C-alpha cells in the first residue's frame, strides 16, 4: 500500500533546518478527537528541531473509528512515538445508549495497542479524555449528551487497559482538573480556551520528549 499523501491526509510539520540532518528526526503521530486537533499545531511548534509531527486531518472520533483507520493514520507512517486518545466520542449518550459501550471500548483499546505493536516499533503514550462541564455541554443541544461521570468511567476503563499492557499514561484529565477546568474549558463545555490548549500542548510535548529522550519542557 502506498504511503498516504501528507497534503491530503495529514497536517505534517517538519521542524528542522534547511540543512540535511545527519540523523533523521524522530516521527511522532498524534491521534485523537477535536481536542487533539486543537493542541496539535502547538505541540508541533514546541517540538521544533526535535521531531516531525504528524496529525491526521480527520477527527479521530471514537475508538472503533481509530481502529478502522489505524493503518492509514499510524502503521503506514512507521512512527517512533504514537500519542493517542479516544473516549469522548465513545461515551456520547443518545437515546440512553452509548456510542461505544465501555466493555467494547476496552476491547477496542486493546486491539489498537496490539495492532500498533504488531505493525511498528513505536513507543505508545495514551492520553486520558479531558473533562466535561455538564451544564455548558447540555446547553449546546447537540443531539446527544456527555457527562463528566462517564468521562471518569471511561478513563478508569482505559487506565486499566494501559496498566495491564504497560503503556504510559498522559493524564490530561487530571491536568485540567488541577489547573481549574472552569477557566480552561470554553463556553461549549468541551473544548478549550487558548490558554487551555497551551497547557494541554505543554503536557503532551512533555510526555513525548520524556518518551523519546527523557527531556522536560516544564
Predicted regions and their residues:
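Bacterial N-terminal signal peptides
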Residues: 5-17
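Short, structured active-site-proximal loop/turn typified by the sulfatase FGly-forming signature C/S-X-P-X-R
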Residues: 52-54
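Short beta->alpha junction loops
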Residues: 56-61
